[in-house]
């Protein structure tokens, strides 16, 4: 039987996500710690991966205890269980920087969702290596930063980008069809905090002209993949994928239009899950508590 969760106006709704080596008693230890602080768990999911020996957990909890006190308890628990963990407010808008080149379908979708509160993101800026999408960003009242990239200026451009990330207190970078490869050093610096949308159902059709490749192969499904960015091009841990039907009569342009619809959907879902702390890294894979 469904029931409402009792809480006061002063209660904080927090989300705890964690990973650690798997062993007996983790769930009991975590929930016990929350219960001793008067926490009321509203959502809980966990997963033990026998192939890696790691345990993953996500808990939403209502509590009137000051957050700093709860964090102190969790830090002690983390030391005992070798946990990597984070604690945040449920629904808090994550400070996000979007990077683009010339195609605007993903940017427009993300900005609309952010403005209409359809995504828990605070878009603090848009970076483009071309000026093409400045008008789109400014239409939504978001500052646009033009950082051109050439082979000769790549290092300086990435230094400028990192300065922007630091000055704006950016928590998440989204590559919304940004057509430049990030250096290994930049990938390492922003590890786990950069999401890319790839215009195919990885690992198929990597590189340029994916829809032309798909057309040449006569595929019956086309898709898109959102993944974390690593130094290995298009090989980062996958967060979300989806597909749509393709017909023998579809031209390259029709396939591209269908694919762009999927790209928008997949990227928005990946961003949502990341900002809601539903995605945990598991080596080269992810655990997604959808």
Predicted regions and their residues:
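Donor/substrate-binding cores of folate-linked one-carbon enzymes
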Residues: 130, 153-159, 168-290
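Short internal beta-strands
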Residues: 121-132
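A conserved regulatory-domain signal marking ACT and ACT-like small-molecule sensing domains
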Residues: 1-94
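A short alpha->loop->secondary-structure connector
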Residues: 114-122
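Histidine-anchored nucleotide/phosphate-binding helix
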Residues: 105-115
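Adenosine-nucleotide cofactor-binding segment
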Residues: 138, 142-168
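Short, glycine-rich nucleotide/cofactor-binding loops
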Residues: 96-105
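Conserved beta-strand segments of alpha/beta enzyme cores
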Residues: 40, 84, 122, 143-145, ...
């Amino acid at each position: 039987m469904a029931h409402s969760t009792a809480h006061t106006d002063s209660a904080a709704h927090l989300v705890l996500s964690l990973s650690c080596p798997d062993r007996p008693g983790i769930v009991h230890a975590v929930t016990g710690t929350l219960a001793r602080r008067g926490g009321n768990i509203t959502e809980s999911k966990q997963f033990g991966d026998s192939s890696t020996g790691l345990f993953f957990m996500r808990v939403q909890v209502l509590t009137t205890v000051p957050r700093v006190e709860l964090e102190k308890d969790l830090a002690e628990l983390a030391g005992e269980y070798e946990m990597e963990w984070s604690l945040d407010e449920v629904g808090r808008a994550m400070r996000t920087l979007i990077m683009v080149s010339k195609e605007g379908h993903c940017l427009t979708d993300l900005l609309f969702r952010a403005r209409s509160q359809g995504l828990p993101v605070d878009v603090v800026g848009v970076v483009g290596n071309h000026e093409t999408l400045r008008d789109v960003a400014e239409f939504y009242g978001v500052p646009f930063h033009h950082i051109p990239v050439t082979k000769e200026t790549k290092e300086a451009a990435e230094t400028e980008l990192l300065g922007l990330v630091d000055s704006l207190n950016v928590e998440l970078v989204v590559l919304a069809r940004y057509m430049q490869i990030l250096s290994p050093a930049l990938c390492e610096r922003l590890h786990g905090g950069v999401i890319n949308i790839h215009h195919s159902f990885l690992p198929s059709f990597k590189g340029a002209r994916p829809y032309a490749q798909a057309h040449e192969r006569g595929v019956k499904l086309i898709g898109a993949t959102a993944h974390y960015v690593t130094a290995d091009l298009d090989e980062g841990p996958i967060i979300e994928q989806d597909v749509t039907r393709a017909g023998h009569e579809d031209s390259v342009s029709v396939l591209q239009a269908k694919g762009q619809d999927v790209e928008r959907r997949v990227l928005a879902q990946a961003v949502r899950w990341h900002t809601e702390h539903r995605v945990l890294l598991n080596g080269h894979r992810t655990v997604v508590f959808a």
